[in-house]
Amino acid sequence: MKKFLLLSLMSLASSTVFAASSTNTIGIVNLRRCLEESELGKKESAEFEKMKNQFSNSIGKMEEELSSIYSKLQDDDYMEGLSESAAAELRKKFEELSSEYNTAQGQYYQILNQNNLKRMQKIMEAVKKASEVVRIQEGLSALLNEDIVLAIDTSSDKTDAVIKILDDSFQNN
């Protein structure tokens, strides 16, 4: 019985030592920082902002024209000075421009959403590749998105290493 107890204790002790020596290490990556601080993320964000500004400028011109026509339609003195056909034409122009504006705005949002999705997919793919390199270099078993981790030691944050690899890859392309 003593031998069995001694063997059980030795077995338990050795399995604990083995488990401690083969502990899987986990790191985290802050995706928001990768998007905001990496060269790729900055480039993609700048291109997205440029596209938004171009759309805003073209929509802005339509808004100005709509506003001008609307002001004329609301000005009783102006409308009384027009012939019935000219007033009807102005109303028709306002309706057509309103419809065109609504269509353009819908297309604008659809294009922006599609572009943003493609941009995020491109960046996420690059972050995944960079994360795999960091995981291998640092001998980690996994790198997780910081948002899904409730608590972890700050030394597990590998975001800077991932950003460095993203920047190196961006400069080489």
UniProtKB/Swiss-Prot annotation:
Keywords, sorted A to Z: Signal
UniProt keyword annotation of RNA-binding present: no
Family: Belongs to the Skp family.
GO terms for MF: unfolded protein binding
Coiled coil ranges: none
GO biological process, one term: protein stabilization
Name the UniProt record assigns to this protein: Skp-like protein
Stored PANTHER family: CHAPERONE PROTEIN SKP
InterPro entries per UniProt: Chaperone_Skp, Skp_dom_sf
Gene Ontology CC terms, in alphabetical order: cytosol
Signal sequence, start to end: 1-19
Domain of life of the native organism: Bacteria
